[in-house]
């Protein structure tokens, strides 16, 4: 299953890879979505009806909600937990890879399935200050990224 981030949403995502992968969305710019259920603290709408089984996050901004929640940060771990509850499945969901589709139609794939947890490094994959840095070497302007896809083992 894939978690797909499209459109203007890309500009406001910060990905950090440590012992696990968390997806941080700066609240001021965060796209807001309908919660999976009314008790959910995560304002993310997940489309599980997609014929390919992908999770597609549409870009929807609501200024009032941004003002109300400007101090909050949503983590992908929360979304994963919500997914697990939504599917009534107690198994862990692993993130296998991140795939970037650039505006020139080229694709960059970053494999997160590292055999040794000690190989993880905070600088391995970071989106910050308008650029994406992979392994501290490859730098990509966020304006050139059309789509970010997280591949999940679900």
Curated annotation (Swiss-Prot):
Domain of life: Archaea
Protein name: Uncharacterized protein MJ1639
Organism this protein belongs to: Methanocaldococcus jannaschii (strain ATCC 43067 / DSM 2661 / JAL-1 / JCM 10045 / NBRC 100440) (Methanococcus jannaschii)
């Amino acid at each position: 299953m894939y978690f797909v981030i499209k459109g203007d949403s890309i500009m406001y995502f910060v990905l950090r890879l440590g012992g696990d992968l968390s997806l941080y969305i700066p609240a001021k710019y965060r796209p807001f979505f309908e919660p999976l259920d009314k008790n959910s603290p995560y304002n993310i709408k997940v489309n599980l009806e997609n014929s390919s089984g992908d999770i597609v996050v549409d870009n929807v901004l609501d200024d009032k909600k941004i003002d109300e929640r400007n101090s909050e940060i949503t983590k992908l771990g929360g979304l994963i937990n919500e997914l697990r509850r939504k599917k009534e499945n107690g198994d862990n969901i692993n993130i296998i890879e991140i795939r970037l589709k650039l505006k020139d139609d080229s694709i960059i794939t970053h494999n997160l399935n590292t055999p040794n947890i000690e190989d993880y490094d905070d600088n391995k994959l970071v989106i910050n200050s308008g650029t994406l840095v992979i392994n501290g070497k490859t730098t990509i302007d966020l304006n050139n990224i059309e789509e970010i896809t997280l591949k999940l083992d679900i």
